[in-house]
From Swiss-Prot:
The keyword Acetylation does not apply. This is Ubiquitin-fold modifier-conjugating enzyme 1. Keywords: Ubl conjugation pathway. One of its GO terms (cellular component) is cytoplasm. It comes from Drosophila ananassae (Fruit fly).
């Protein structure tokens, strides 16, 4: 089910060990530290391979995440706001990643711009609790979604390039 490129990307993202969500205040801080280390490593790997495609930051508690993601198509950079909350049942429940400005523009999206990850990503996440974290959600959830949906939305004229 996972291709060689995805397998290589995954093998370079550190796995997490601490099983804690926002409700476990003391241990959550340790989990957040692991999350940041994993994200930093993933972004560094992306930069080294020339495939840098997102920036994220969180609120102080690490429960709300926001930033930008972008997709290169025919040498044009399409940029989108990205946001998600960490569910109280995290890491058992994966975060629901949203691209609010694309809300209602594709069938593979729920209300509020949350991308559809049920078929492929959620079963994989469930098998890898607590080892998977935010970096894995970006690599296995948002990245493939962007790769499939954005070219289709561009081709249909639903989204257009915006000059900076």
């Amino acid at each position: 089910m996972v291709d060689d490129s995805t397998r290589k990307t995954l093998s370079n993202i550190p796995l997490l060990q601490i099983r804690a969500g926002p409700r476990e205040k003391d241990v959550w801080v340790q989990r957040l530290k692991e999350e940041y280390q994993s994200l930093i490593k993933y972004v560094e790997n992306n930069k080294q391979s020339g495939s840098d495609w997102f920036r994220l930051e969180s609120n102080k508690e690490g429960t709300k995440w926001f930033g930008k993601c972008w997709y290169m198509h025919e040498l044009l950079r399409y940029e989108f706001d990205v946001e998600f909350d960490i569910p109280v049942t995290y890491p058992t429940t994966a975060p629901e990643i949203a691209l609010p400005e694309l809300d209602g523009k594709t069938a593979k999206m729920y209300r509020g711009g949350k991308i559809c990850l049920t078929d492929h990503f959620k079963p994989l996440w469930a098998r890898n609790v607590p080892k998977f974290g935010i970096a894995h959600a970006m690599a296995l959830g948002l990245a493939p979604w962007l790769a499939v949906e954005i070219p289709d939305l561009i081709e249909k004229g639903i989204i257009t390039y915006k000059e900076k």
